[in-house]
């Protein structure tokens, strides 16, 4: 009942709000500028409405709070997840707004985005520390590592790293929305197993909102989530793993996000050290496009990889 309410509310609010938001951009003749360094055939997407993350963030907030208040009360953990979602979403919103105003694909400077992410991560840590969250990591094969105050650095790194990882992965229609549905759905199952109702409510609200968003974001996308959506989802995903004390599970559940990020790092290092590129283009989803794969094929294969990582995680935890 609780799961269904959060999921349905998230989907309904997104389905109702997104058409109006798309129409707003079309009337103003504004949209996403596509970077010239990407695949040439992506240029036809230029002008597609963006910042769809604004709608599904609102949908997640409404679905989470309504379901939380009705069934369980708005607990601190639920409010902190919403804080991370909104704070990281606002960073992306500012970034997207600059791009739209300048009509180019360059927004925030890297240090400005990083500063906002660090502040968000630090606030999240300070609050969860007071709620009694264990400041430790359960590392398979190595046991439990008690980090104490050093856990703050881990939290900041985790939220910042995964928000940027999801952001890097958002280069194909429907890719991140599908992967996020799988990842948050997996954490909803883990939260239910732990009887952590607030986190379960939040995760199901995200799943519902993502399913609603996919109606408009599948190829050919009628709207993009923008940095507002991808940064918010990545930060929230990391925060969920922390509140469930399953931080390192995100490496498998979010395996595609990890691989996308590693492909960029390896590409840059290889080119600087040897003058040669490992991939035809990075992030790695573009590499497969350059090999002749359609966007749908990349989406489906990457979704399957994400699903396999999630299934392995569930088998090991439950």
UniProtKB/Swiss-Prot annotation:
What name appears for this protein in its UniProt entry? Phospho-N-acetylmuramoyl-pentapeptide-transferase
Q: Could you say which EC number(s) this protein's record lists?
A: 2.7.8.13
Which GO cellular component term is one of those annotated? plasma membrane
Q: In which pathway does it act?
A: Cell wall biogenesis; peptidoglycan biosynthesis
Its ancestry begins with: Bacteria, Bacillati, Bacillota, Bacilli, Lactobacillales
The residues that cross the membrane are 2-22, 51-71, 74-94, 114-134, 139-159, 172-192, 196-216, 223-243, 251-271, 298-318
What family is this? Belongs to the glycosyltransferase 4 family. MraY subfamily.
Provide the cofactor list for this protein.
Mg(2+)
> Where can this protein be found?
Cell membrane
PROSITE patterns with a match to the protein in the record: MRAY_2
Any idea which UniProt keywords this protein has? Cell cycle, Cell division, Cell membrane, Cell shape, Cell wall biogenesis/degradation, Magnesium, Membrane, Metal-binding, Peptidoglycan synthesis, Transferase, Transmembrane, Transmembrane helix
Q: Which reaction does it catalyse?
A: UDP-N-acetyl-alpha-D-muramoyl-L-alanyl-gamma-D-glutamyl-L-lysyl-D-alanyl-D-alanine + di-trans,octa-cis-undecaprenyl phosphate = Mur2Ac(oyl-L-Ala-gamma-D-Glu-L-Lys-D-Ala-D-Ala)-di-trans,octa-cis-undecaprenyl diphosphate + UMP
**Domain of life, per lineage:** Bacteria
- Species of origin: Pediococcus pentosaceus (strain ATCC 25745 / CCUG 21536 / LMG 10740 / 183-1w)
GO BP: any one term: regulation of cell shape
Tell me what topology the record assigns in the membrane. Answer: Multi-pass membrane protein
Q: What does this protein do?
A: Catalyzes the initial step of the lipid cycle reactions in the biosynthesis of the cell wall peptidoglycan: transfers peptidoglycan precursor phospho-MurNAc-pentapeptide from UDP-MurNAc-pentapeptide onto the lipid carrier undecaprenyl phosphate, yielding undecaprenyl-pyrophosphoryl-MurNAc-pentapeptide, known as lipid I.
């Amino acid at each position: 009942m609780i799961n269904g309410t959060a999921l349905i509310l998230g989907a309904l609010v997104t389905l109702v709000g997104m058409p109006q938001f798309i129409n707003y951009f079309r009337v103003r003749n504004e949209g996403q500028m596509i970077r010239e360094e990407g695949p040439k055939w992506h240029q036809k997407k230029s002008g597609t409405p963006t910042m769809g993350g604004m709608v599904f963030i609102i949908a997640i907030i409404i679905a989470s709070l309504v379901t939380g208040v009705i069934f369980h009360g708005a607990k601190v953990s639920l409010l902190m997840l919403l804080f991370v979602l909104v704070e990281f979403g606002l960073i992306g919103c500012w970034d997207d707004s600059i791009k739209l105003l300048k009509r180019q694909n360059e927004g925030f400077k890297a240090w400005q985005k990083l500063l906002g992410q660090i502040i968000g991560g630090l606030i999240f840590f300070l609050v969860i520390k007071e709620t009694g969250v264990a400041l430790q990591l359960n590392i398979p094969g190595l046991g439990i590592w008690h980090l104490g105050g050093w856990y703050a650095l881990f939290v900041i790194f985790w939220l910042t790293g995964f928000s940027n990882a999801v952001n890097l992965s958002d280069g194909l229609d429907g890719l991140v929305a599908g992967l996020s549905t799988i990842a948050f759905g997996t954490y909803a199952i883990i939260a239910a197993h732990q009887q952590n109702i607030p986190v379960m409510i939040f995760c199901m609200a995200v799943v519902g909102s993502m399913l609603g968003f996919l109606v408009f974001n599948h190829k050919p996308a009628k709207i993009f989530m923008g940095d507002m959506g991808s940064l918010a989802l990545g930060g929230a995903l990391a925060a969920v793993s922390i509140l469930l004390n399953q931080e390192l599970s995100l490496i498998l559940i979010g395996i595609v996000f990890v691989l996308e990020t590693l492909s960029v790092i390896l590409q840059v290092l290889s080119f600087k050290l040897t003058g040669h590129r490992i991939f035809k283009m990075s992030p790695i989803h573009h590499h497969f496009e350059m090999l002749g794969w359609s966007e749908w094929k990349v989406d489906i294969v990457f979704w399957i990889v994400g699903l396999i990582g999630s299934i392995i995680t569930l088998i090991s935890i439950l």
